[in-house]
A protein has these predicted regions:
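Small beta-barrel nucleic-acid-binding modules, primarily SNase/OB-fold domains
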Residues: 2-6, 13-168
Length: 168
């Protein structure tokens, strides 16, 4: 009974929170923005997607695309209020025109559907369409997924560390 009462109390808060607007005060990269939430900055990691890193081809294009659509504007969040290991809030960003920023990035070829963390097939459909039309990064001959790029960078930095840290 107490649990049901708690849920009845919590449900309107969750619904209200998702209808609240937040100002985007920063765009860190294609899939990470900063919003003003209750007067404090909150970093938001766009769920379902992974954009190229800034040092990758199309990384800065993804950041600019996201920035053009949302920087300095009011947005809504569609979120389960979960955070990733870096304490970033995971969410879909809903723009003032009703479009979903996360989906717009995939649709225009600036992000991959991050299947490891998402089972939403609508993102996969958008990615396949962008690939077919050779939009954005799909115009590149051999685009490297960001998770593969990060993995290769991690391996090369570990190899260079181990070769420079031999005991004499």
């Amino acid at each position: 009974m107490i649990y049901k009462t708690f849920l009845l109390f919590l449900f309107p808060i969750i619904i209200f929170s998702q209808n609240k607007s937040y100002k985007v005060i920063g765009v860190k990269d294609g899939d990470t923005v900063e919003i003003l939430m209750d007067g404090k900055p909150q970093v938001v990691r766009l769920s379902h997607i992974d954009c190229p890193e800034k040092k990758q081809p199309f990384g800065n294009n993804a950041k600019q695309f996201a920035s053009d659509l949302c920087f300095g504007k009011k947005v809504k969040l569609s979120t389960g209020w979960k955070k990733d290991r870096n304490k970033r809030l995971l969410a879909e960003i809903i723009l003032s025109n009703g479009k979903n920023l996360n989906k717009e990035l995939v649709k225009n070829g600036f992000a991959w559907h991050f299947k490891k963390y998402s089972k939403d097939n609508s993102y996969d459909d958008l990615e396949q369409q962008a690939r077919k039309l050779k939009l954005g990064l799909w115009n590149d001959k051999s685009p490297t997924a960001p998770w593969e790029w990060r993995k290769s960078r991690k391996k090369s930095s570990q190899q260079s560390f181990s070769s420079t840290s031999k005991i004499k």
